[in-house]
A protein has these predicted regions:
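Short glycine/proline- and charge-enriched loop/turn segments
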Residues: 1, 64, 71, 130-133
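Extended active-site neighborhood of metal-dependent phosphoesterases/phosphodiesterases
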Residues: 1-48, 53, 78-91, 109, ...
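Active-site neighborhood of phospho(di)ester-bond hydrolases with catalytic His/Asp-centered motifs
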Residues: 23, 55-58, 91-101, 114-116
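Short acidic, glycine/proline-rich loop/turn micro-motifs
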Residues: 23-25, 66-70, 126-127
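Active-site environment of divalent metal-dependent phosphoester hydrolases
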Residues: 27-30, 61-66, 93-107, 121-122
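Short acidic, glycine-rich surface-loop motifs adjacent to enzyme active sites
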Residues: 49-66
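A contiguous binding-surface segment within folded domains or other stable secondary-structure elements
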Residues: 62, 66-87, 92, 99-102
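Binuclear metal-dependent phosphoesterase catalytic core
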Residues: 85, 107-192
Length: 192
């Protein structure tokens, strides 16, 4: 998947949807990166089909999450470079990201960013400011069940489901007692 410039970037063409995967890794940096070479590749890739709904898949989200030590700030140069490319392409419906080890949904530039939790330990959901000079014993990484996202294209929108890979206690099952509810719900919908 090398794009010819040493970055792992590629496009998946589906019948009704495009997924453009970009490399936001920079050696020696924890946060994201997006240089002019990557910007040129993304701009050219997006220009190939301006009509088909497209989602950009990337590790680092270009937004502040509220988990301060994991934030990406809007004034970081790579964010401006990336944002300028995306603004030129109206077919980009949203972004699919990771990095935060926490499920987050963000409205960004008129698009939706879906950020998935991790299949490894999670980042603690702590929205307090953090002082780099004064450790305060807050939890930073927590042992929650591994998590994942399932993205489903319904022909109009991308629908994202988030779940944890642990066992779940069943509270209700589809049996004769719930059959009337299911029938009522289906009767409310247009026939297909």
């Amino acid at each position: 998947f090398d794009d010819g410039n040493g970055f792992v970037q590629y496009t998946v063409e589906l019948p009704e949807l495009r997924l453009v995967t970009i490399d936001t890794l920079e050696e020696g940096r924890h946060g994201g990166a997006f240089c002019e070479q990557r910007a040129a590749w993304l701009d050219a890739e997006l220009a190939k089909d301006g009509a088909k709904p497209t989602y950009i898949v990337m590790h680092h989200p270009p937004v502040e999450s509220g988990i301060e030590w994991m934030n990406t700030h809007a004034d970081e140069p790579w964010v401006a470079t990336f944002t300028n490319v995306v603004r030129r392409h109206d077919q980009v419906r949203g972004l699919i990201c990771g990095h935060l080890h926490r499920s987050v949904t963000v409205a960004w530039e008129g698009r939706t960013i879906a950020i998935c939790s991790s299949t490894a330990p999670q980042v603690s959901l702590d929205l307090r400011p953090i002082d780099a000079d004064h450790p305060d014993d807050r939890p930073m990484i927590v042992a929650e069940d591994p998590a994942y996202a399932l993205h489903r294209w319904n022909g109009r929108e991308l629908v994202s489901f988030y779940d944890h890979a642990g066992s779940h206690t069943m509270l209700a099952k589809y049996d004769e007692r719930l059959q009337p509810l299911v029938r009522e719900l289906k009767a409310e919908r247009p026939r297909q």
